[in-house]
Amino acid sequence: MDSSIAHYWAQADGVIRATAWVLLAMSVASWFLILLKLWAWLRMRRASRALDQFWAARSMDEAIAALRPADTESIFVPLAASAQQAAARRLDESSMAARIDRSELITRALRQRINEAAAKLESGQTLLASVGATAPFVGLFGTVWGIYHALIGIAASGTIAIDKVAGPVGEALLMTAFGLVVAVPAVLGYNAFTRVNRKLLAELDGFAHDLHAYLTLGARPGDES
């Protein structure tokens, strides 16, 4: 008896094949997203290492210009630019907005950019979580459907023997294995990027704190006068 995957595919009906194609699409999508986010993370690391150049500059304009080539993912530069714009903003003295303290304006600008950066970092992770959660059940559906049709075929043949049962059932279990192969990388990728994003956001929050201190007090926390 030929128990190869090719034989199983040749014997599979439309439902099994459709299930396999769905799992394949889920796998391709999750791997594409994992590689894309990995590439983006590597570029963000490059930007974070360039923060020393930012603080070594003599002015905010020079600092932003020095950081821009390294910040290809636009995570740190928009934060600094928005804070600078908020600090330099001139308001009509008669307006209600003019009563807001400049420190609060800078804080609001920084918070808005941090929220945007968080949304950017977390983009796509819902897909990874969904693939990791549903792929095993999609594979299990294919297995149940395959076993059902295998048992129907065995009943139609009128003979019950271990070799007649083990072959079709074993082939049907391939769908469960396929579902796990799809789910495991998605779950690992989701967990890894969740941890990485937490560290990046903490670093971004620290950068925002330093920016706020510089623009309101004229110095970074810890700098000697």
Task: Kindly label every feature range from the protein language model.
Residues R17-L33, A129-P136, V182-V187:
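Alpha-helical transmembrane segments of integral membrane proteins
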Residues A12-A65, P69:
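Transmembrane alpha-helix/interfacial motif
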Residues A6-T19, L121-L128:
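Membrane-interface helix-boundary signature
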Residues M1-G14, A155, T159-A161:
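Short, strongly hydrophobic alpha-helical membrane anchors
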Residues A172-L188:
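Hydrophobic alpha-helical transmembrane segments of polytopic membrane proteins
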Residues D13, W31, A63, A80, ...:
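Residue-level signature of catalytic and energy-coupling elements of molecular machines
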Residues R46-V138, I147-A161, L188-S225:
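Predominantly long cytosolic amphipathic alpha-helical stalk/bundle segments
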